[in-house]
Swiss-Prot record:
GO biological process, one term: spermidine biosynthetic process
Reaction(s) this enzyme catalyzes, per UniProt: S-adenosyl 3-(methylsulfanyl)propylamine + putrescine = S-methyl-5'-thioadenosine + spermidine + H(+)
Localization, UniProt: Cytoplasm
Descriptive protein name: Polyamine aminopropyltransferase
Family label: Belongs to the spermidine/spermine synthase family.
Length: 284
């Protein structure tokens, strides 16, 4: 009998992957966690039936959420990562020797434990001595911080369930306060393609714009995320991700990446017209 993992992207659209084995299924205090194995995408893990990470395409997401801000300001030393229980974002950050401290805040310890066991590809650097993991609510954690971080990466789930508070006006205001005067905020910004995701994207963008003088959106193609067309938000008190891109300094680091490069950095901020229109329209 064939086994298929199926995820509902809209009322009328579903996405399926043929599964060889289910490696883990469990319920934490916050959410259901499943790990599957497939021929096409390798091992992948889901939360409450929604795709988070696959071994085959995780490099795209983690490259784009990490290297865009790092190439804009290669002097970043102190980083806060909210969410990111799979460890992929932290893995990419630890490649920068100039980063001195990475605080990672993940609400669900079981996510981290499961990813360490089944997804060492992404969780391999969580033991780095610069990494400090806090198992608590990111919304509450950031409330207590002021003028502390050079970069905050919000690597959250979608805006419901445990990740809901990470899309609120209060949260973005606290992120602004927690950043230094030249700080950068990067977040996963949902997809513009299906209406329900586009609504969340517009709301997040509007709220971030209320606090940050520089507020841009960039894109990547992530095959296993709804529609494949995924957005990220870049907000800063000082740096423009295009004008301040330091290609020479970043390329001199000699980092080998599978998706990101500094040409792509320039291009990913060039958005299709329908996305521009969505961002320009005020959220109803």
């Amino acid at each position: 009998m064939e086994l298929w993992y199926t995820e509902q992207h809209t009322e009328d659209v579903r996405f399926s992957i043929k599964v060889d084995n289910q490696l883990y299924s469990g319920q934490s205090e916050f959410q259901r966690i499943d790990v599957f194995e497939s021929k096409e995408f390798g091992k992948f893990f889901t939360l409450d039936g929604l795709m988070m990470v696959t071994e085959k395409d995780e490099f795209i997401y983690h490259d784009m959420i990490t290297h865009i801000p790092m190439a804009t300001n290669p002097k970043i030393k102190n980083v806060l990562v909210i969410g990111a229980g799979d460890g992929g974002t932290v893995r990419e950050l630890t490649r920068y020797e100039t980063i001195e401290n990475i605080d990672m805040v993940e609400i669900d310890k079981l996510v981290v434990d499961i990813c360490k066991e089944y997804l060492p590809q992404t969780a391999s650097k969580l033991e780095d001595p610069r990494v400090h993991i806090y198992y608590e609510d990111g919304l509450k954690f950031v409330r207590t911080k002021e003028n502390e971080y050079d970069l905050i990466i919000v690597d959250s789930t979608d805006p419901f369930g445990p990740g809901e508070g990470l899309f609120t006006k209060e949260f973005y205001g606290n992120c602004f306060k927690a950043l230094k005067e030249d700080g950068i905020l990067v977040n996963q910004h949902e997809s513009p393609y299906y209406a329900s995701y586009a609504k969340s994207m517009k709301r997040a963008h509007k709220r971030i714009k209320e606090f940050f003088p520089i507020c841009k959106v960039y894109q990547a193609h992530i095959p296993t995320y709804p529609s494949g067309h995924w957005l990220f938000g870049f907000a800063s008190k000082k740096y423009d991700p295009i004008e301040d891109l330091n290609s020479e300094a970043w390329n001199a680091l000699g980092l080998q990446t599978k998706y990101y490069n500094t040409d792509l950095h320039m291009g990913c901020f060039a958005l299709p017209n329908y996305v521009k229109e969505l961002l320009e329209k005020e959220e109803e």
